[in-house]
Amino acid sequence: MARRIEVRAPSRIDLAGGWTDVPIYCSKKSGEVVNIAINQYVRSEMVIDDDRRLSVSYSTDMPTGSGLGTSGAMNVGFITTIMSAGQNAISTAELAYQFEALLGNQGGRQDQWASALGGINHLTFVDESVTCETITPSNEFCRWLENNLLLFNSHITHVSGDLHKSVWRRFEVGDEEITKGLDMIRDAGLLMARGLKTESKSDVIDAMNLNSAGVDTLGRELHQPFREELSKLTEQNKVSAWKAMGAGGGGVVGLIISSEHLRDEIIDQFNVKGWTNIPWKIDIDGVTRQEFNL
């Protein structure tokens, strides 16, 4: 019988700790990442006709190279599409990661886990293992995050593999500055997890600022496309914290505004610059799969 399989996989916001999920780092000490699955999706569809011929198609709400984990979500969607119904989310995430590794991706595991699981998660990486703690702030605190953490697509594409290579090359030879930066990012992940669990806005802001300082220690070029504009807003006390999403060097930037009443003003300001605001909500479902007989 002909059938159609529809899959939806969310992308993510990496609040803090990204970079430390890469195996070369978490083989030495734990990686600590906090991320949020969001309602910017990769959708895949597979149609199997009566003669068992296949047709597979994909669409994405965000372009790849945006820093929102779209590539990881795409592979979670692919694995979910071709596997049988009822596949465990953790198994799906690991299969998607291993699939990317076969294609030469040397990044970490956070994107696949965020997309497969949904929600807000504190992920701890030790060697090849992943431990997940789901964080469930109150509805009020979630609304604060959704209303005060703004995302903007700069339309400057980054290639995360190129950005990662130089950092990890230096880390492997024991570069103290790189190690310091990565450890700062790890500490930011732990602080962010604490801030979300205790609903401390100041901890969330401090964690994002610590994460950005750690990324700047890895290389100031990673935040350079955003620095001039966002430094001005920080000095004006309109922005409390900001960071590049993903590896940086372009793509999407996230910023926490100091007051919700500044939201429209800041969106208008960046629209003039050519940046696009990305409205978002927390996705709690993770990857979903529906199958229909035709």
Locations of regions flagged by a protein language model:
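C-terminal nucleotide
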Residues: 1-16, 21-27, 35-53, 84-88, ...
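Conserved N-terminal helical subregion
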Residues: 31
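Glycine/charged-rich beta-loop-alpha catalytic/anionic-binding loops adjacent to active sites
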Residues: 52-64
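Short pre-catalytic strand/loop immediately N-terminal to key active-site residues, enriched for Gly-Thr
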Residues: 62-66, 240-242
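Short, non-helical or kinked segments that cap or interrupt transmembrane helices
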Residues: 69-70, 109
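Short, conserved phosphate/pyrophosphate- and ester-handling motifs at nucleotide-, phospho-/glycolipid
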Residues: 71, 246
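Glycine-rich nucleotide-binding loop
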Residues: 248-250
